């Protein structure tokens, strides 16, 4: 069986947020996948596709796996968006410098959409978020996902406080 040529995992960093966008491993490639996760300091994986591997090995390495699948090519449900943004806010506040991995099948649609939502909620314009991710992950997003991101209205849930306890709401006029 021919192996699909999969893009390498890419790290997306913005403000205090670090994400790793990747494709899904199989049980056969799981050890290499875990090595990659550890290299980037991943503590949580969000799996947005159907399960293709047993999470026991990953969990044994201290990496928490969350299953939030949604249909390929489609936008995430409001419930998934709410869970994702809550996770991002809590993880980066409680574990500064940590990295959240997100994967779908190829790492080109569903996973980049969630990362783009975090960037938009962090203050980036939708066009900039798309371009920022596409610079690292060529071919990311289909037209339906782009339309979803364009229409998405941020709730500004990812405003973090600085070390003095002040909200980081900087605005350039």
From Swiss-Prot:
Tyrosine-protein phosphatase domain ranges (all copies): 8-161
Residue list for modification Cysteine methyl ester: 170
Domain of life: Eukaryota
GO (cellular component) term, any one: early endosome
Binding site for phosphate: 105-110
Start and end residues of each stretch annotated as Interaction with ATF5: 97-132
PTM notes: Farnesylated. Farnesylation is required for membrane targeting.
Reactions performed catalytically: O-phospho-L-tyrosyl-[protein] + H2O = L-tyrosyl-[protein] + phosphate
Matches recorded under Pfam families: PTP-SAK (PF22784)
SMART domains assigned to the protein according to its UniProt record, in alphabetical order: PTPc_motif
PROSITE patterns registered for this protein in UniProt: TYR_PHOSPHATASE_2, TYR_PHOSPHATASE_DUAL
Topology with respect to the bilayer: Lipid-anchor
Residues with lipid group (S-farnesyl cysteine): 170
Compartmental location: Cell membrane; Early endosome; Endoplasmic reticulum; Cytoplasm
Disulphide connectivity of cysteines: 49-104
Coiled coil: none
Positions annotated as propeptide: 171-173
Catalytic residue list: 72, 104
MF terms (GO), sorted A to Z: protein tyrosine phosphatase activity
Entry similarity comment: Belongs to the protein-tyrosine phosphatase family.
Function: Protein tyrosine phosphatase which stimulates progression from G1 into S phase during mitosis. May play a role in the development and maintenance of differentiating epithelial tissues.
Quaternary context: Homotrimer. Interacts with ATF5 and tubulin.
Protein name per UniProt: Protein tyrosine phosphatase type IVA 1
